[in-house]
A protein has these predicted regions:
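Class I S-adenosyl-L-methionine-dependent methyltransferase catalytic core
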Residues: 1-166
Length: 166
């Protein structure tokens, strides 16, 4: 996600972080999780497939003082999703989730069914007050997004960002 897109996104989200839990399913550098923590999220779950990038995220978490709040998993988001959902649902005090689904754009086409199922699962599992944030390439059809939610979609070329509240 480009810097200006991220700034616009966090401006749109406003105070959704207060005591919420951030989940970044395609973490990359971890910036969305770290930004969420810096804005009041109590914890962040970051999933990154690339082992070097996951290691870098761990180092950054430590440098920023988020090493106890950031739960970093190296692996496939599609395979780890259920485990993360179970962990989040076991919390004695349920908090809203802020779920970021911002994969490499090609995954929206190459893994269409898996992406749709991933979104459906998080939408069905997230507690009331949660939000789902998706970044898609501007030409990606919005039909991939679960149609049982109302999506606020904005264009930030070359991306479009869709947010739904649960």
């Amino acid at each position: 996600m480009k810097d200006r897109t991220r700034e616009a996104l966090f401006s749109r989200l406003g105070g959704k972080f207060d005591s919420g839990i951030a989940v970044d399913l395609f973490a990359g550098t971890g910036v969305l999780g770290f930004e969420s923590l810096s804005r009041g999220a109590t914890e962040a779950w970051l999933v990154e497939l690339d082992s070097k990038a996951a290691s870098d995220i761990r180092q950054t978490a430590k440098q920023l003082g988020f090493d106890t709040q950031a739960h970093i998993r190296c692996g496939d988001s599609f395979l780890l999703a259920e485990h993360i959902i179970q962990q989040l649902q076991q919390s004695p005090t349920p908090s809203p989730w802020l779920v970021f689904v911002c994969p490499p754009y090609t995954l929206w086409k190459e893994q269409y069914d898996a992406m749709h199922q991933l979104l459906q699962r998080f939408c069905a599992s997230a507690p009331e007050g949660s939000s789902i944030v998706c970044e898609l390439e501007e030409k990606t059809p919005l039909e991939i997004l679960p149609n049982n939610l109302e999506w606020d979609v904005r264009l930030y070329r070359p991306a479009q960002v869709a947010i739904a509240d649960i």
